[in-house]
């Protein structure tokens, strides 16, 4: 059906997954399946809201519709969903990929990340993103509760209005970690055989995103070798799981480019779900090279007995 099928799975270790029969939705003549959404609305990105006192609205999610906009939904259990205001939109055009709402416990605001469109008849498709905030006690279903704090397209802050011809934003989702916003960026490489890649950016409060990693072509997850299920397409999940001193990021992979071209060397599944693991706090770093180097940090007001550094060195290296 238009909008697709959304399914539920659970796991004790994050690797081996169980797909329970939910008996919620009939599909193919049977309700013995793990489907929790069929058709519209679509693109659920659920989270548990610690700021919500109403148990029936404990889970929240941004959702998209065939109108190509973003609305919000709530649930008591993450499986049975009700749209706020019967699915009335809270944003404008072009939220047609993955939108996300989340709670920022440090700033004590809700944050909403959606795709948007800056294209004209002259430029054609130009995809960007908008980032919005709402107060802790706001009616999240009311568009007037939301304030836009960023609207941007790759290349704008560099004065390059044609950058979108080589790389476009498909979605930007937020992951809050240690009080810092981390953007999980899904991008179309229009100048590279229309492959899809994942990148990361950071921001504090409402300041602009630091995009140096995406401009430096430093992908968060490397695509697989040609012929593997993830050799042409990497789509990151909208959140990261941190446990056992690692960050786990699930992603959807395909051996198909955005233009529909399949890898000619495909020898196994054409798509699937992958898992990327990163050592704790290991997603960004400074590298000195073999010649050594030095850095000067901002002034730090330290209270405690022990200060540690997260570093990796070669066999004869030192700090």
Predicted regions: what they are:
Residues 1-319:
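Carbohydrate-active catalytic/glycan-binding domains of CAZyme proteins
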């Amino acid at each position: 059906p238009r909008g697709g099928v959304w399914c539920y799975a659970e796991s004790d270790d994050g690797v081996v997954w169980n797909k329970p029969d939910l008996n919620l939705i009939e599909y193919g003549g049977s309700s013995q399946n793990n489907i929790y959404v069929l058709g519209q609305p679509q693109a659920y990105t659920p989270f548990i809201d610690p700021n919500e006192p109403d148990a029936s609205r404990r889970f929240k999610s941004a959702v998209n519709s065939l109108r190509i906009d973003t609305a919000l939904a709530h649930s008591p259990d993450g499986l049975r969903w009700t749209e706020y205001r019967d699915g009335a939109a809270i944003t404008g055009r072009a939220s047609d990929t993955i939108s996300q709402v989340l709670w920022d416990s440090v700033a004590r605001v809700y944050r909403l990340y959606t795709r948007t469109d800056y294209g004209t008849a002259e430029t054609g498709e130009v995809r960007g993103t908008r980032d919005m905030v709402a107060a802790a006690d706001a009616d999240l279903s009311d568009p007037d509760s939301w304030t836009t704090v960023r609207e941007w397209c790759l290349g704008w802050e560099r004065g390059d209005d044609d950058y979108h011809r080589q790389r476009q934003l498909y979605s930007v989702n937020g992951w809050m970690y240690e009080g810092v916003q981390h953007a999980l960026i899904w991008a179309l490489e229009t100048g590279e055989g229309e492959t899809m890649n994942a990148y990361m950016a950071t921001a504090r409060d409402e300041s602009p995103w630091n995009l140096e990693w995406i401009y430096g072509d430093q992908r968060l997850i490397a695509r697989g070798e040609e012929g593997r299920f993830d050799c042409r397409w990497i789509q990151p999940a909208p959140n990261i799981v941190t446990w056992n001193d690692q960050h786990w990021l699930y992603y959807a992979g395909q051996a198909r480019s955005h233009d529909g071209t399949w890898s000619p060397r495909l020898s196994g599944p054409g798509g699937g779900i992958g898992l990327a693991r990163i050592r704790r706090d290991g997603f960004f770093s400074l590298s000195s090279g073999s010649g050594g180097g030095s850095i000067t940090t901002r002034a730090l007001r330290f209270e405690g007995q022990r200060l540690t550094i997260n570093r990796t060195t070669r066999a004869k290296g030192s700090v």
